[in-house]
Every structure is written in structure tokens, then in C-alpha cells.
């Protein structure tokens, strides 16, 4: 009898532990993925709420109303955006649109606030008594809408007709100040957009690009980590390198001769970085990439960002060599590439990107205020200082001179990434960088650049325009 009671107790304990484990896992999953599940377009609770609530306003950091609602006499709610078309187009991807064509914009990802799911019971009762539609909360963003418009205008001036992306953030706080994706569209007439144009796609957060030579920042960090003599060691660049029977060329078949890490970084020497990758091995390079967030599952509070990839299979010597300068199967979004530059600027510390500054009820009661959070420490402060020096040399004497702004200490890295689009070989131009005298980092991508061009001639001038605008904001 005692033995039987013991078995029952053991079974009860096992079941209790199992339910506790399931409960803990459930709460953990809700904490991580809850908002993503909640904002799913077919959530019946959300769809029902949208019929009975006037969505709150969305404002930029200066109080400019980016989206508001108009209610007709028959109770029909219409979402209204800024009167200036260029301003509407500049922020459409970060906001989203009322038709739900843009995935994971503020309009959808902040549904819980905009449609009043956080509203208290007394506010709900008041709305029922008066018979009026309840109003959702107002969301203030960290972005500067004028900066977004300036970025769009720079693209139109310097890369007319090109697709691309740009993002700007405060590297000390993680605040996203600007985010623009091209092609863009007018949210007031989104039904006229051709599906084939990919205009609904937010390239900043949803489009993982081949990073090209911007990834040399990670390779250089790996060298500094594993090789005590990395700064002084020289490798020989002959203009081409044969690995596994395949030839790796430098841009224009340039031959740099004996070259150290700083000069190789400044001149963006592919041969040198292929040799660095081969000498340190795939494991060391992958670990460095993962310290910067590659192969991570990005679960940021305010943004849905596509994961970045450092490949873990099919790692031939040729693929490892190509990885050294950001080719092979490595991919990263412009948002993540911006975080790489931001980590260097912030002494090795990568901040979580944040987009929501404040949420307030229609009566002004604060529901939420922004808080900064460290995402990860990518490298030591000393390593970050060395890389900052290298990135400064890129802008003063290397491939990124067109990003220079008088009166600002700009550091950066250019990239020209070979990839394909609809089966056609193309090259994308990239620039990542930051300013040392003001806390801003950025990433610019220009897609399908012309033959003979690179990130230094396409993306860097747009970065220069952005930095110049930021300088005048101070």
C-alpha cells in the first residue's frame, strides 16, 4: 500500500513538473513572440477591434503627425497621412499602410496600442455610455520625418530609378532616426502599385543583402581577436588568388603587393581578406560573425528584422576565402549592417534598435516610454578603437572619400557585392559608417549599380548627404 502511494506521489510530482515546464515555456514564448502572434493579420480579435475603434495617431520625434484618422458622419474611419506626397512616400515603409500591404510597419506591429487594447476599463465604459467610437493610443516614434524626406531626395538625386535602402540610428541609445526603402509608393493610393515592383517590401528590415566588403569589418575584428600580430603582419596581394582551382580577383585586377591589415582594409583588398579568412579558419570567422549577431534570431521589441546568415554548410576553402570579403552565402539586412558600424562607434557595444519613443492615451496618460537596451557586446573596446581608426582611414584616404563631410569625423566602409536578381548577375553598392563627433551610424545600399561603379561612388555620396543633414540638425 505504501509503495502504491509512493508511485501515485511520484506520478503526481511528474505531472506537476511537466505542467510547470509547459507553463514556463508558454510564458517565455509569449514574452518573445507574443506581439508577433497578436498582430497576425488574420487574428479575429484584432479584426473585430478595428471595426469599433478609431486608431490613434502616429507622430515623429518632433511631434509631426505622420498618420491620423478621419471619422465621417456615418462612422466610417479613414486613415489620413501627411499632405506632402514626398513626406508620405519617405516614411511609408516604416509606418506601413492602412491596407496592410507593408508587413510589420508601425500600423500593424503596434496594433495593441493604436487600436486601444491597452485601454483601461473606465475608458471603455465611458465610450459605451457616450455611444462614441473609442480612440486608440497615440504612438510617438524616434524617427525624424524630415530626415527621411532628405534621404529620399538624396536617392532621387544621386541614384534616380534605383532600388535601395538607408537607415540611420543613434549608436549610443539605439534610436532609429531615419529609415527609407526604395522603390517607394504613396499610401494614399496604394492600390495603384504594381505587385511586380516590390514597392511594398521594406528593404531595410526584410531584405538580407550580400554584404560584400562591408563584411571586412567582421573579418578584421576576427583577425584582431585571434592573431596577436594582426596589425603588423603583412600578406602579399598579386591581384588574383587561386583557391580550389578558382581565381579570386581584386577590383580592377589591382595588385597591392605586401600589405598590412589597416591598408588592406582602407583599400578594400579582396585578396588580403581571402588570405585572412583561410589563415584563421572558418570556425574563427564564424564565431566573430556570430558575436556581431549573425545566425541570431532577432527579437527586437519595436521592429521585425530578418535574420542575418553566416553559412555553416558547404564550407570549401574557396567559400571560406570568399566569406573573408563578404561573398559566399553571407547575408545581412541594412538594419543589421548599420548595427555593425554602430557597435564599432559605441566601443564594441551593440544597442538594440528602438523605434517607439512614447505611447500616450488620447487624454495624455503615458502608457510607455522608450528605454535603451544593450543587444550584445560584439568586441572589446580596444578592438573597436582599432577598427574605428581603420574606418576613418577609409574616408580620409581610401575607398570612401566621397562620404567625407567638412567639420565631421566620418568613419566608414564601402562595399560592392556581387549577387543576382531574377537570374541576372548584378552588383550592389554599400556604405556603412558613423560620425565620431555626433552619435549617428548609418547604412546605405544602392541596388544594381552600373559597371565600373562601387559602393564608394554610389552609396558613399548618399551617406555624405545624410551626415551633412545630421550635422545641420545639431
Which stretches of residues belong to each language-model region?
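Active-site scaffold segments
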Residues: 216, 338, 460, 464
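Periplasmic/cell-envelope proteins involved in peptidoglycan metabolism and beta-lactam response
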Residues: 1-192, 199, 208, 233, ...
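Beta-lactam-recognizing serine transpeptidase/beta-lactamase-like catalytic domain environment
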Residues: 62, 126-127, 172-212, 218-448, ...
